């Protein structure tokens, strides 16, 4: 039975993740809002919103869960060659709005978008609150790839990525994983199975194991100053 989240009750707790439906896989709750407080409460439990235009807000905790441990990142020979050629320059938190807009445009062209205007506004507010972050790849001064997600505890919850030229999103991910690992993040959540992400080293784990890691990695936080270190500079 789905839990209905009252949009007027910011203190209402989410149900335990293991109460999620088996079909559709991981659907946990419906309703509520996309306020900063609500999003923070969700991500601290490993829960994320995902819904289409015209649908109510849906909250998910799928089983199994796709994750990428930084040390497991797999860089192909061709991508390694691309990185050695220095075709891209990288930054983080330099163009969050542009990254999320590009992610929405990509999905809209291919499969319809879940990144509605409300979702984009919510994550932009989450970014201003210091929780959501972006990584960017640039070429000749143009934004050609990137990704965004949510940093909570020692977990980075990846949300979406895009590319406009070959290998730009993969290169941005490699840069992001390097930064996140250096700063002390222990796990990158990739939500649901993707053959593309599996080829880069991601793997599925049972929800019970994922939730145990959420609890463990939420006990300590990465120094927020890490995200303030040269935040608009190219690296």
From Swiss-Prot:
It is an enzyme of class 2 (transferase). Its main location: cytoplasm. SUPFAM superfamilies: Acyl-CoA N-acyltransferases (Nat) (SSF55729). It comes from the Bacteria. GO terms for cellular component: cytoplasm. Its EC number is 2.3.2.6. One of its GO terms (biological process) is protein catabolic process. It catalyses: N-terminal L-lysyl-[protein] + L-leucyl-tRNA(Leu) = N-terminal L-leucyl-L-lysyl-[protein] + tRNA(Leu) + H(+); N-terminal L-arginyl-[protein] + L-leucyl-tRNA(Leu) = N-terminal L-leucyl-L-arginyl-[protein] + tRNA(Leu) + H(+); L-phenylalanyl-tRNA(Phe) + an N-terminal L-alpha-aminoacyl-[protein] = an N-terminal L-phenylalanyl-L-alpha-aminoacyl-[protein] + tRNA(Phe). The keyword Nucleotide-binding does not apply. It is found in: Cytoplasm. One of its GO terms (molecular function) is leucyl-tRNA--protein transferase activity. Functions in the N-end rule pathway of protein degradation where it conjugates Leu, Phe and, less efficiently, Met from aminoacyl-tRNAs to the N-termini of proteins containing an N-terminal arginine or lysine. Belongs to the L/F-transferase family. PANTHER family: LEUCYL/PHENYLALANYL-TRNA--PROTEIN TRANSFERASE, LEUCYL_PHENYLALANYL-TRNA--PROTEIN TRANSFERASE. This is Leucyl/phenylalanyl-tRNA--protein transferase. It comes from Methylococcus capsulatus (strain ATCC 33009 / NCIMB 11132 / Bath). The lineage of its organism: Bacteria, Pseudomonadati, Pseudomonadota, Gammaproteobacteria, Methylococcales.
């Amino acid at each position: 039975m789905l839990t209905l989240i009252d949009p007027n009750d910011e203190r209402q707790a989410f149900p335990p993740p293991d109460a999620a439906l088996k079909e559709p896989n991981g659907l946990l709750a419906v309703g509520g809002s996309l306020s900063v407080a609500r999003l923070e409460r969700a991500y601290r439990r490993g829960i994320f919103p995902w819904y289409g235009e015209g649908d109510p807000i849906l909250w998910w905790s799928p089983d199994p869960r796709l994750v990428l441990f930084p040390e497991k990142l797999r860089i192909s020979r061709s991508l390694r060659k691309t990185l050695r050629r220095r075709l891209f320059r990288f930054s983080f938190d330099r163009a969050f709005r542009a990254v999320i807009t590009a992610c929405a445009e990509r999905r809209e062209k291919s499969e319809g978008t879940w990144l509605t205007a409300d979702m984009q506004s919510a994550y932009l507010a989450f970014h201003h609150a210091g929780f959501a972050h972006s990584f960017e790849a640039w070429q000749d001064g143009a934004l050609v790839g990137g990704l965004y997600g949510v940093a909570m505890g020692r977990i980075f919850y990846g949300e979406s990525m895009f590319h406009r030229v070959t290998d730009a999103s993969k290169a941005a991910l490699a840069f992001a994983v390097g930064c996140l690992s250096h700063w002390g993040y222990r796990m990158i959540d990739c939500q649901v199975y993707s053959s593309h992400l599996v080829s880069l080293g991601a793997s599925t784990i049972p929800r019970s194991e994922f939730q145990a890691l959420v609890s463990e990695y939420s006990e300590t936080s990465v120094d927020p100053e890490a995200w303030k270190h040269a935040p608009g500079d190219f690296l």
